[in-house]
Amino acid sequence: MNKSNSMNNTSLERLFQQLVLGLDGIPLMDVHWLIYVAFGAWLCSYVIHVLSSSSTVKVPVVGYRSVFEPTWLLRLRFVWEGGSIIGQGYNKFKDSIFQVRKLGTDIVIIPPNFIDEVRKLSQDKTRSVEPFINDFAGQYTRGMVFLQSDLQNRVIQQRLTPKLVSLTKVMKEELDYALTKEIPDMKDDEWVEVDISSIMVRLISRISARVFLGPEHCRNQEWLTNTAEYSESLFITGFILRVVPHILRPFIAPLLPSYRTLLRNVSSGRRVIGDIIRSQQGDGNEDILSWMRDAATGEEKQIDNIAQRMLILSLASIHTTAMTMTHAMYDLCARPEYIEPLRDEVKGVVDASGWDKTALNRLHRLDSFLKESQRFNPVFLLTFNRIYHQSMTLSDGTNLPSGTRIAVPSHAMLQDSAHVPGPTPPTEFDGFRYSKIRSDSNYAQKYLFSMTDSSNMAFGYGKYACPGRFYASNEMKLTLAILLLQFEFKLPDGKGRPRNITIDSDMIPDPRARLCVRKRSLRDE
């Protein structure tokens, strides 16, 4: 028996030598590399198999270049062609249902005429946060806490939004301080080229930290650094893991530098939040952390639970807001004819009553400009994202099995005259489109930047619309207003509006672009 085993082993060794060694006995590859290549080949085939799988929803799929294009290639192309694929589908089907294939999932695209049908399901049968968690591998990026309860939504809706009018002076105070730290020093009449995208992130980070942590802790540099790093590491980690089969994610994730950075951010964030909670005495603090601590019940009260929610809320409130603001700054500099009318409006409001509780509500033109900029350059091309956990059949007979992910092509809709109000064609940028319509008292509230309806879902729609949109709107209007009063902005000589970068179904302002800034002086008044 031992002899037989010895012979078999010898035979296997010879076979292996023939495969690995050349005729001259020269190694073709190291044994370890053979193992790596074999594993890599298996992994590639497995990934292609996963990318080639598709949903069972029987509606047209858009994006294929030909009948011969493999599904895995279409999913990869969606990363950089997502915007055009969605637009192609909307233009072709418009009022009927279609689907797109992206990395990790298929998305059934619902036109607005079906919205009332699909939004009727109760929250236990549909989750609007789940698509975000899935896209960014929430199990590894610590996003699963949002699936456990809606503590953060309760705090925003019940505590933050009712307090917004009293927060204007608080936010302005922190913005004034932030400008001294984040705008570079410059001489009178000196134009300085700046990275406006990064500046916006830092300005919004500081304002948000004031609202999130209160005046005593908002300038904690560890927290400010963490919130900036966390978003970047989460995005990179989630994007990479999206193409990795679930069975391999526990092994691949620890190898990613971004994942290790993310874990460090989470650990640091827990420490900061824990220290603040332990240092707080009694009630009366007017900040999100205090409200969240007071509203938490059961497991929500755990420091780790609260800290993770604070990190994700910071991600949502800072980076989408900063990108929207960067888009608006690019639009403003590309269309300088809007600068003086907007500045005059801000001056008129402030001269009349200062930054009182109603100041931001009276900036009608500024509100309109931000809404029009968002119409052209939304951060998200698809909104009303949700996953259904109950099978349903729509009025046209389309069956959506349990587990179906749906979304609305909000950006494509906002390029369609059927969904864009006013006499100016939707293909033309009209910064005062909405303020002109709102001059009619019948539409005074309908076309606010923060308002949503079935034609404009940039912030979502209905009870699942972004709960923080009213805060974000005020933050953006305040920031743009102060910048207009204190600075001049323009594009570098010979440059046009920076082109947007579309990644998957997101529209990102070019982070490489620069703007020129100059302090305004008394003679500019």
Swiss-Prot record:
Query: According to its UniProt record, where is this protein located?
Result: Membrane
* UniProt cross-references to InterPro entries, sorted A to Z: Cyt_P450 (IPR001128), Cyt_P450_E_grp-I (IPR002401), Cyt_P450_sf (IPR036396)
Q: What terms describe the molecular function in GO for this protein? A: ent-kaurene oxidase activity; heme binding; iron ion binding
Q: Name one GO biological process term.
A: gibberellin biosynthetic process
Q: Which GO terms describe its cellular component?
A: membrane
Q: Which positions are tagged coiled coil?
A: none
- Catalytic activity, EC: 1.14.14.86
Q: Which domain of life is it from?
A: Eukaryota
Cofactor(s) required for function per UniProt = heme
Q: Which residue spans traverse the membrane? A: 31-51
| Topology class, membrane | Single-pass membrane protein
Its UniProt entry gives the catalysed reaction(s) as:
ent-kaur-16-ene + 3 reduced [NADPH--hemoprotein reductase] + 3 O2 = ent-kaur-16-en-19-oate + 3 oxidized [NADPH--hemoprotein reductase] + 4 H2O + 4 H(+)
Keywords tagged on the record: Heme, Iron, Membrane, Metal-binding, Monooxygenase, NADP, Oxidoreductase, Transmembrane, Transmembrane helix
The signal peptide annotation in the UniProt record is: none
Q: Which residues make up the binding site for heme?
A: 466
Matching PANTHER family, A to Z? CYTOCHROME P450, CYTOCHROME P450 MONOOXYGENASE AN1598-RELATED
UniProt miscellaneous comment: This protein is poorly expressed and has no detectable ent-kaurene oxidase activity in this species. Consequently, this species does not produce gibberellins.
Name of the protein in its database record: Ent-kaurene oxidase
Q: Which organism is it from?
A: Gibberella intermedia (Bulb rot disease fungus)
